[in-house]
Amino acid sequence: MGLTVVYAKETWHVLGAVQSTGGASGVPDAGPLVGASLELRGIRALPGPAESGAAPIAVPVDELAAAAVDAASDLDGFPAVLTTPFAFGVTVVNEQPKSALVPLNDGWGPSPVAATTRRITVTLPQPVAEGSPALVLVAVGAGPPRSLPALVTGPQLTIDTNLSAGVYPVLTLVRGVAARIDAVQVSA
């Protein structure tokens, strides 16, 4: 059985996985697997209007890549990456994905993302290596999410942005740390 993951190019986070019953047929491009974007759901807390059907975050295909990986199994003999993809990262060497997945640190606090109309602040679990790439994606209506890249320079990421007050789905990707989706209340 083959196992293919779709991952974030910049931070190497696994965002989705599929298992095929056929033999390995090479590594596909992410596009044929996800189309124009990969819709992610899994918001941990939905305050306010988002409870009635917040849009998922649709990660654009140009932010994604695909890789054939080893199917390490959990206790039930089922590849754990199929049930908890956000908990894994792809091993990348010389810009090429390898077949081994790595488990990621999930030491997030209960509400690590705070936002105002001018800035998003993410409190990071520790330790996170200085200079690690990060990507925060904010779903803003029906269009593509706002992509906010950053580098880790301390215990928090602070990213300038321009948002209206309201509740937004936010995907946080920091290399080495489990991916996370939250509904974030943006205050004035």
Protein language model regions, located:
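Surface-exposed coil/turn segments at beta-strand junctions on protein surfaces, enriched
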Residues: 115, 152, 163-165
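Extracellular ectodomain segments of secreted/surface proteins
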Residues: 80-129
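Short beta-strand edge segments in extracellular beta-sheet folds
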Residues: 184-188
